[in-house]
Amino acid sequence: EYTMIYDMQIDEKAGHVYLLPWNAKSIFVYNLQGEYLKDIPLNGKYEKLIVPKGKFKVDAEKNRVAVVLLPFNYLPVVAWVQDMEGNFINEVPMNHLKVKPDFSNEVVSTKAASDALDVFLCTFWELRKDTLYHLNLEDGKLHPKFTMNFGQRKIAIHDYHEFPRHYVGALTNPVQVGDRTYQTEG
């Protein structure tokens, strides 16, 4: 029925389970008994849009879905807010966030923000200073929330996570151990 689920959300109040597969055109909606209910289309504005790796947050009461995807440089947007029928309400262009197509990159979210989707774009080979953002479900904009100052040091592979009362930044350095082999150390 589905393979390679990249993100999910359980909404006990609405009685729904939402599943986002890898390379998705829609979010699958099930009830809490596991019965399929419907799809939420994700490409309402851009017919050929496929979410390669993405995170989402559904607000069933407000009929809104926030989506952030791994912003490959050929895609039109990095994030958007839409209704449950796939109609875009707001969108965020990629600008400085775009990355070369490389599936070692990740979209990170703990879904800790109550009124937004917290998200960090973790780039593995394209190292750069970046920020943990909130995609606000009301205004559809990315708001910066947390970053680390690397100063004059080399930028390490890093990711940021949000929790209810704090942020965590994790640093990792790749070490070449063979001709084409790396391992990481923290």
Language model segments and positions:
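Eukaryotic scaffold repeat domains enriched in small/polar residues
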Residues: E1-G186
